[in-house]
Structure formats: C-alpha cells, structure tokens
C-alpha cells in the first residue's frame, strides 16, 4: 500500500482531466466532477491518516522517468510558445524557451552525475497541502458546475468551453499533488511549470482583451520564477551532484555554500506567491470566473509558492536568503493590508487580503525558527478555508446582483440569507476568536 495511495491521488485528477477534455455530455461531466471530487477528498484523508507523523519516501528516478519529465517540460514549453506566437508575446516566449533549454542542457551535461535517491517525500507539510488541495480544491470544482452554467447564460458572448475549463482545473489539482510530494527538484520543477500554465489558461478563459492581457502578465511573471528554478537546479546538480530538496536542506544546515541555490528558490517562491513587486498577476486574475480566483487564492497556485519557502525555512534565518524573505514578506504584508482596507470592490479586497497574508507567511518562514514556520503553516490552513469560502460567496453574490461593489451588497441579508450566513462565517474566520486566523496571527507575533 506504500506507493498505491499517493499514486492514486496523483492519477485520479489527471485521468479525470483527460476524460473531461473529450467528453461533451453535460450530465456525464457533472457526475464525473462530483464523483472525482469525493474520491479525491477521500484519498487525501486516507493519505493523511496513513502518513501523518510517519514520513514516507519513494525513489523512482530512472532514465525513463527523466525522459518522461523532459517530454512533459517540452510539451509545456511548446504550449507556451504556441500562445505567445499567436498573441505576439515574444519576450514571454523567450523566457519559456530559456528555462526549457537550460533544463535540457543540464540533463545532457550533468544529468548523469546529479542523482536523486528519494524522489517523493510525503511529510507532514506535504500532507497538509494535500488535504487543502484535495478537499477545498474538490469543493471548488463541484461549486464550478453550477457557477459556470449560470456564467455562460449571462455571458453569451463568451464561448462555452466548460469541458476545457474542468480539464484545466483537474490537471491543476493533479500537478499540485505532484508538486507537494516531490523531493526531486527536477520533478518539482515540471509540476511547478504545469501549475503556471494552468493558471494562464484559466485566467484567459473568457478570451477578452483584458483576460488575455492579465493571463500573459501571470505567465511571464511565473516564467521568470521558473527560470530561477531551472538555474537553481543546474547550480545544485552541477556543483553538489544532487537533485534532492532534503539533501539541500541537510547541506544548508551543515553550513555548506548552497545559498545561491536557496536564494534562487526563494525568488521563485516570490513570483508564485505574488509577493511585491509580482502581486500584479494575482490582482489581474480577478477577470477570470470566480472558481478560478478561489482556486488560485486558496488551494493551488499561490500556496505552491509559500509551500516551497516554508520547506526552505530550516536553512533560512540570519542569511541573505532569509533576510530577503523576511523583508519582502514584511513589506508585502504591510502595503497589501493598507491597500485592502481602501478598496470597495469585493474581489479586490479579498485579493489584497490574500497577498497580505501570503506576505506574513513568507515573513514567518524567512525567520528560520521552528515556531514561526509552524505559525506560517497555521496561516496557510486557515487562510485556505476562510478565503475559499469568501471568494465563492462574493462570486455568487456578484452573479445575483450584477456587481461586486461592496455598497451594492446592502440588504443582502434579506435577499440572500443563506449566502449571507456563509459570508459572515468566512469573515469571522479571518479576524474573530476563536477562529484560526486570529490565533495564527497571535502566534506570529509570539514567534517574532
């Protein structure tokens, strides 16, 4: 049973995505999404029960696996190239090609020397991220069924591509599972790039000029982080002959000169988690349908960035990479919080709030202390729950009222009492005792 559950957890959303891509029957799609979401949540819980407190490592590295991963990288690069040429975004295409060719060059130059014994590592942090993606991500997928039906009735000018939408959502979740379980940085890089590509496709779903512009903003910023990731892999493999994240942490704690690798990976985490000055892509994602915003903010995209930085926390602290994380995270937390309280657009309030909380998470992880790292994990958990609920309720209110301006929500308790109750629960979860976000932020102050 050791490898079976993690393999099933990764394969289930991937197979579901492929079936949804070719299926054109709405009834089949609705049933498949609901059943897959239920099974995904059950498998996530099963993995948590089996491995929490008992880390499990798997070694699968082989020339064939390297070839498969390189083929996936190539397919992702070709997809990026296709869209960049189609919309004449040549600098973005250059970023994508640069990192792909860097990985290919590394494989041919140092790939045979740089090895990985344990390619997947299911530790407590991975389990927490699996539960967030599996349960919250599955619920968002189910919510999307009703939301997207109404969305296309109200936006008749937008081509109905729901099969493609759900394909990308489940591919996103599969990549997220692969990413958080990866210990081999080459494998993590592949899943990392798939999440960047999926976010690009979801943000640009409507095909409007604004959606296309914002999707490419997300793409080039995340490709910049992907290039840093590729450089980190090449440096680590070429100088230290390993590709394992766990080995990098061991070398860092032994005071070996791995800080360039750590700094590159932290920078990569900044781009994915929308730290300033890269927060623009997450704000631009609001043009996408509400389920996309909920998915990006709560259970997938931005959580991948903070996941990587939290994983690096043991070797951060009083060094350049740690100081960089604390400084960027702290500045992002402060300025995004100030921006959030000055907005009247409901989604903008939530977006800036997300960015500020991500900044606090990064700042905590940057200290390198055990207490602050676990505080960061607490914020990740409670933020995922509260923010997903708030995005979904605000999105539903927007559909019903035709506006997401907070002033238009006046009287919502009378017109939509059940929705209002869910919204209040989400709001309370963000700042009132005994809900988790208040406890997490109190713990953050104590940790500092």
Which positions does each model-derived feature cover?
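Hydrophobic transmembrane alpha-helices and their helix-loop junctions in integral membrane proteins
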Residues: 139-188, 198-448
